[in-house]
From Swiss-Prot:
Alphabetical list of PROSITE patterns matching this protein: RIBOSOMAL_S7
Name of protein: Small ribosomal subunit protein uS7
Subunit-structure text: Part of the 30S ribosomal subunit. Contacts proteins S9 and S11.
GO terms assigned for molecular function: rRNA binding; structural constituent of ribosome; tRNA binding
Record family assignment: Belongs to the universal ribosomal protein uS7 family.
Species of origin: Burkholderia multivorans (strain ATCC 17616 / 249)
HAMAP family from the UniProt entry: Ribosomal_uS7_B
Length: 156
């Protein structure tokens, strides 16, 4: 991390189909080796699946899923007097979004459906309902923070 000045955040352009910045960020996060068209096909395919199977607005399902998966607190290691403590800290808004997207991606990858679009559609639908692998990860992080609440006075 640079110590001189704060590095400016890059502006992410909204995606062409839905005009949503979060969808564009998720596509960029899903993209491998610069293959954006493949990432677009996966995300839009997942959105079509949500539309046909659930009959709900895919953009709404996506935003609800993201908001459900966002963590509020996490633990950070802090060394105090020769012992490492897991100190619960609040998560910055930008990191919340990044973690939620990362967890959704990883949970979708672990699913057993045939195509990535189907996996992502299933994971987004489940996360919007408060279930699924990404929600399990968020609950695990929250549980760790709750268990280590006694060390919250070791602030950073």
């Amino acid at each position: 991390m640079p110590r001189r000045r704060e590095v400016p955040k890059r502006e992410v352009l909204p995606d062409p189909k839905y005009g949503n910045v979060d969808v564009a960020k998720f596509m960029n996060m899903l993209m491998l080796s610069g293959k954006k068209s493949v990432a677009e096909r996966i995300v839009y395919g997942a959105f079509e699946q949500i539309q046909t199977k659930g009959g709900k607005d895919p953009l709404e399902v996506f935003t609800v899923a993201l908001n459900n998966v966002k963590p509020v607190v996490e633990v950070k290691s802090r060394r105090v007097g020769g012992a490492n403590y897991q100190v619960p800290v609040e998560v910055r808004p930008s990191r919340r979004m990044a973690l939620a997207m990362r967890w959704l991606r990883e949970a979708a990858k672990k699913r057993s459906e045939k195509s990535m679009a189907l996996r992502l559609a299933g994971e987004l639908s489940e996360a919007a309902e408060g279930r699924g692998g990404a929600m399990k990860k968020r609950d695990e992080v929250h549980r760790m923070a709750e268990a280590n609440r006694a060390f919250s006075h070791f602030r950073f």
